[in-house]
Amino acid sequence: MGATAATVGTAAASTGDGTLTVEVLRDFFGTGLINTTMDVPQRGMKVQVTDPAGHKVTGTTDATGKVLVPPSTELTGGQYRVDVTIPAPYNKHLRAAPAATGKNHFDSFTTFVDVSDGKDDSVITGVWNPADYALPDSRYFVPIQNTADGKDTRALVAFGTDKRGTCPGDAACPTALNTQDQVGTTFALAYDKYQKRVFQGAFARRYTPYGPEGGDAIYTTPTDGGSAPTLFAKVPGATVTPHDATNMIKDAGFTNAPGKESIGGMALSEDGSTLYAVNLLTRRLVSFDATGATASAPKATVRIPDPGCANPGDWRPFGLQVHDNKLYVGGVCSAESTQQREDLKAVVYAYDGERFDTVLTQPLTAKRGSVFGSNDVEQATHWNPWNTSLATWDERKVGNVFIDPQPELASLAFTRDGSMVLGFRDRFMDVVSWGGLDPRPDNDAPENGMAGGDINMACATPTGEYEWEGTGNCPNHATPATGGGQDASVAEYFPGDFFGNGVHAETALGSVAYIPQQQWVVSTEFDPTVNVATSGTGYHNVTTGQGPGNAPAANAYQFVSREQSGFGKAGGLGDIAYEAANAPIQIGNRVWFDGDHNGIQDPEGRNEVPLPDATINLLDADGKQVATTTTDAAGEYYFGGVGAAYELKPGAKYTVQFDVCTADTSEVPTQPAATKLRFTLPRAGDNRAHDSNVTPPKTGRLCDGQAPVTAPDKPGEVDHTIDAGVYIHKAKPPTPTPTPTPSSSEPPSHEPPASEPPNHPGPQSGGGSGTGGGSGTGGESGTGGGSGSGGGGGSLANTGTSGLLKIISLSALLAGAGAAAAFVTRKRRAGQH
């Protein structure tokens, strides 16, 4: 799909101009620098281009993230101001990304270009969702499940995202954060970056008990390991079936409870205010106030609608994930009522707090890799209807091993481009075990099960829909060389979840997670490093799909040994969460020479130029200097952001000191000494993205001014509206001495004044809806910038001068039109993007 031309109707730039390209990328790193391999195009962003006369053209970025402004007649002059804003609904989750002054950096949301005389120019700016941010040394959290007589006492472990290999052995073992005695058997996790704790939900699995607070319990554990877990809340009415505590190795009456009772997935809202959980028994979404140490009761309970299963009782919601300020709910139609494979399907809803919208429906009828052995055994190579009937119990076997993969959509993750990774758990492995006893009366034979979960991809399309792996433009990466010996007809985006060639072609255990700054999707797996009857994590390349089966030493981490685990190849791990972080904040932007002294950042020209080498100091609330920098060739500066020497404190009071006495004035008309610069009109116009923040000082060094600033109070937000405009003050001429009245009778002559009155234009009208001041960033409705429409739409249109002076100024502009090539423009983008 091609880039969209900016339009007012079909308008574009002057016929003598080159082509302007405005590109918006979604950033995930917050350094202010473009990452050419991981940043992705962002559609739907509003772009406005304004010429010196106030004429405007607008456009919206397309699927490539671009707006093209070709030559036309709507704009004149060749030098323009470009403003980018984030419209609804994107402004609910996207913010302006941090910018920088280094090589290959993102431009600010307000940028100045020169396409005069056929030159091409470009702007590349960034947006991001700060909720995506994680530190390079982030950790994963994974629950460990064990049988009642198992040797592993760990219930929650944490380990670095770089861990590979076998523990113990050639890799360090993870840190245990709590124990089986403290929380029992759990699955769901949600990490709280605001309070640095993990929520952990009880889980129904045969042969292994609930924790001390029962099957409806949600626990919290500090991630520093400094204290024991505590009960956070209970999900009302989540369980009815008790374990057989006197004979847990058989647990005969619990065969039908897994997947139908206790707690399914959990997710925390991006602002940390709400914890969501799925009540598997009632099929309801339960939400809790997550801001306190405990929650005495849910704040809301909502029915998750049946998507049209063969029978309403077949609907089994489970997985939860928050992405871009929406909650996604995954589940399956289990086909339990019909026992017909064609009734199996996966469904994903998007929930905005009011309604559930179906975003994915996928039949689960296709052939898969074999759980064990031959590719010709249908039961081992397909998903099967849910069934735990004791009357047909022996039909769950393939040979002497229980193999009957029954799908649960247990987890969801989203990649950088919005594609959806789905983790399917084999529900039957929560019914059987590895060495547990037959549930039927008078039969105590030990039984072994082999898990057959999966990891699948639904690729996002440019129109916001999804395509299943192997269809449309969503690749099938399975080949004889990568697929682990599975049948050639099997299509998989992630074919690397296998053990050996032709042994186990589906080793995924159903939990997935994805950190956007990394290149792999992590999945729970059995036998990840080729050691038998073990558990750990596999790492799947998000581009190629290759995983632990393709290179176990490089793509897997084993941390549950055969000796530790009572679940063996049935799998003994729960969900995966990662340690997200609060993204740093940033302030700053631009110092410019305001030749017309109107206080508005007009398109650059001979009288509107950036001011390099101005010294910018950041002072804290006590007046102490905490950071310093100088403006670059574009007049820009920034404090904060990822990797900055000084990390701004959210919501703190600061003062930005603009010492323009050091500025380079070589491009300023008449090249005055920097000490002659004075600050322009402050807070002019209605658009805080285009004004100057400094109230001109009246004493001391008049080229050294200050602007008070309150730093953004939410993680990852930026305020690129802290600007300073300067001009050269022209002294008023002295009042001439009155001419004595002649003594003759001749009438007195009326000489014209010695000079024109000084031109001090008033504030211009127009502007967007951002607040904060300066050449800014932000969404249409947010603080911290955003240019909106209007905003100093041309210095000629609203100068506040007399009609005569307007004509004089317009004549001067027309006379200088042919000298446009002499205007100073910002060249830095051309060689750096």
State what each model feature region is.
Residues 2-10:
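C-terminal segment of classical bacterial N-terminal signal peptides
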Residues 14-34, 582-602, 615, 721-730:
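A short, Gly/Thr-enriched small/hydrophobic beta-strand-prone motif that recurs across taxa
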Residues 65, 71-585, 635, 681-683:
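Sequence/structural signature of beta-propeller domains
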Residues 760-810:
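Extracellular Ser/Thr-rich, low-complexity/disordered mucin-like segments
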Residues 805-833:
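C-terminal membrane-anchoring or membrane-association module
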